[in-house]
Amino acid sequence: MFDSIKIALQYITPKHLISRLVGKLAAAKAGGLTTGLIKLFIKQYKVNMAEAERENPADYASFNEFFTRALKDDARVICPNEQDLAMPVDGAVSQLGDIKHDSIFQAKGHDYSLTTLLGGKPELATAFKNGKFATVYLSPKDYHRIHMPMDGQLTDMVYVPGELFSVSPLTAERVPGLFARNERVVAIFDTPKGKMAMVLVGATIVASIETVWAGTVSPPVGKNVVHWQYPSEGEDAVFLKKGDELGRFKLGSTIVACFEPDMVEFADYSAGDDTRLGDVFATLTQ
């Protein structure tokens, strides 16, 4: 009963307004008040600050600085084997498996459209039909930067406006088409073995989504789908190596990774399993 009420409230609350207000508060530099809030957050969510580049909460001028904190260089090891893809985030597996033509599994009783996920762009979705997908949820305690599973040349980025439902496991079970409804940023890469899509999905109180090449993408792009294309050479070209930072969430969310058919086999993960940046995510089949 309580779960049903929580979901119902998400449909009627002004999620965008709340998220933007929280974003402004998280960006505020309020001295001791900011430090106090950070300490409360660390205690509430049991954040491991021993891994952080800056361990002292007082060293962060804003909550956003803390939330997108860097880790120490030796805190994560990127799997070295060239055949292995690196887990792109700390988090927990929501779902992973086969893309069945244009359909991605969300939770029991709920699938959603690959094409819709990628911004309603059939020309981008075609490469991934009957391929593989993995959805990973980042909880509040997690490190919130996203890294590359493998080397890739950026070809396309799509901003897709949408809702800002929570992306918690409960919401994934109850809200149809959740990841294809929420605001998101899609990045398409050419890799040595085929195409890879990395989809950064927004959520309630996610103040912004950033990429290393474009900075803040959301907000304030607007209410229309926006599609950027990138060259393979020149000053606007973007090439990222395995383990490089791709982007970050300010206040947490979910990533969906998609791969071409016959390109990868996932490591032994199941729904609910914890993930750690740099561990073996998948192995190339070619």
Curated annotation (Swiss-Prot):
Bilayer topology reads: Peripheral membrane protein
Q: Which GO terms describe its molecular function?
A: phosphatidylserine decarboxylase activity
Q: How is it modified after translation?
A: Is synthesized initially as an inactive proenzyme. Formation of the active enzyme involves a self-maturation process in which the active site pyruvoyl group is generated from an internal serine residue via an autocatalytic post-translational modification. Two non-identical subunits are generated from the proenzyme in this reaction, and the pyruvate is formed at the N-terminus of the alpha chain, which is derived from the carboxyl end of the proenzyme.
> Which InterPro entries does the record cross-reference, listed alphabetically?
PS_Dcarbxylase (IPR003817), PSD-B (IPR033177), PSD_type1_pro (IPR033178)
How does the cofactor bind to this protein, according to its record?
Binds 1 pyruvoyl group covalently per subunit.
Q: Which UniProt keywords apply?
A: Cell membrane, Decarboxylase, Lipid biosynthesis, Lipid metabolism, Lyase, Membrane, Phospholipid biosynthesis, Phospholipid metabolism, Pyruvate, Zymogen
Q: Which GO terms describe its biological process?
A: phosphatidylethanolamine biosynthetic process
Q: Which cofactor does it need?
A: pyruvate
Spell out which residues are annotated as carrying Pyruvic acid (Ser). 253
Question: Mind telling me which residues the site (Cleavage (non-hydrolytic)) is annotated on?
Answer: 252-253
EC annotation from Swiss-Prot or TrEMBL: 4.1.1.65
> Superkingdom of this entry's organism?
Bacteria
Q: Which residues form the active site?
A: 90, 147, 253
- Pathway it works in: Phospholipid metabolism; phosphatidylethanolamine biosynthesis; phosphatidylethanolamine from CDP-diacylglycerol: step 2/2
What this protein catalyses is: a 1,2-diacyl-sn-glycero-3-phospho-L-serine + H(+) = a 1,2-diacyl-sn-glycero-3-phosphoethanolamine + CO2
- Role noted for this protein: Catalyzes the formation of phosphatidylethanolamine (PtdEtn) from phosphatidylserine (PtdSer).
> How does it associate, per the subunit comment?
Heterodimer of a large membrane-associated beta subunit and a small pyruvoyl-containing alpha subunit.
The cross-references to PANTHER family, in alphabetical order and at most eight, read: PHOSPHATIDYLSERINE DECARBOXYLASE (PTHR10067), PHOSPHATIDYLSERINE DECARBOXYLASE PROENZYME, MITOCHONDRIAL (PTHR10067:SF6)
Per its record, how is this protein called by name? Phosphatidylserine decarboxylase proenzyme
Organism source for this protein?
Pseudoalteromonas atlantica (strain T6c / ATCC BAA-1087)
Q: What is the lineage of its organism?
A: Bacteria, Pseudomonadati, Pseudomonadota, Gammaproteobacteria, Alteromonadales
Gene of this entry? psd
